[in-house]
Amino acid sequence: AGMVNICYCLNFPELPLQGNYDDTKYKIYFADSGLLVAMLDEEAQEDLRTSKNLGVYKGALYENVVGEALVKAGYKLYYYKRDDSTLEQDFFVRTASALIPVEVKAKNGTAKSMRTLISSEKYADIHCGIKLTGGNIGYSDDIYTFPYFCAFLLKRYLAGVNI
């Protein structure tokens, strides 16, 4: 009934996305991040509201907000987790000719898995990535950085650039 968004695990990060995922492996995100916050225990809610202390919830909340924005922009949700390593990517979006990993960073840090996906010849459909952080807009080493609140604009941005 539209309460959750399902994010399927890709078998391999390559195009096409449809038919390239395992429907038995998935993550579930709330379709409304406000409901997620409302379901937290009272102490955690108070901590969020009064002291803005996101604590252990920060990564999950930001990932949920970005997943919600991507769905509302018209994307289906996909992630990748390689079984034999620590390689994991939060989301993927696509253009007509490229697959673009999207990383949600709760803290400003390196996106190690994304760098591996971009630099390895095994992932031929991936040429650049998008990192969403609490920081400013930037570009370095084939990674475009945007503030979280720009997630809903990714589709429009990607339509206007040649990636």
Task: State what each model feature region is.
Residues A106-F146:
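Catalytic cores of nucleic-acid endonucleases
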Residues A98-V102, C128:
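Structural motif
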Residues Y79, P101-V104:
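Short catalytic-loop micro-motif centered on adjacent basic/acidic residues
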Residues G135-I163:
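Domain-level recognition of nuclease-like catalytic cores that cleave nucleotide substrates
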Residues A1-A96:
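Accessory nucleic acid-recognition modules appended to NTPase machines
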